[in-house]
């Protein structure tokens, strides 16, 4: 992979057993170049009104980006303003990253809860 390419991957967190839990993320993976913008989407289970986003760089643990509760930002990690988000009335969510940098190459995770 060339130095100007960013490899983005997403992980869908699914529950086990007969209880429907989890989220659906899209797209499942992306390849972008430095300076571009990306939007990642997360749809949570019906009734889950809290959505959290995390970034996990290779060889590291997940880092908290931000959390939304009922369409309002409810907490934010140590990420620059070019990382922004939204939560919609149906409690689905978006993570937007502007002016991509090489260090943004990571696994992006979303989680939902009541």
Swiss-Prot record:
Question: Signal peptide position in this chain?
Answer: 1-21
Q: Give coiled-coil spans as residue ranges.
A: none
- Keyword Lipid biosynthesis included in the entry's annotation: no
One annotated GO biological process:
adaptive immune response
Cell location: Cell membrane
Gene3D superfamilies registered for this protein in UniProt = Immunoglobulins
Give a short account of what the protein does: V region of the variable domain of T cell receptor (TR) beta chain that participates in the antigen recognition. Alpha-beta T cell receptors are antigen specific receptors which are essential to the immune response and are present on the cell surface of T lymphocytes. Recognize peptide-major histocompatibility (MH) (pMH) complexes that are displayed by antigen presenting cells (APC), a prerequisite for efficient T cell adaptive immunity against pathogens.
Q: What is this protein called?
A: T cell receptor beta variable 5-4
Source organism of the structure: Homo sapiens (Human)
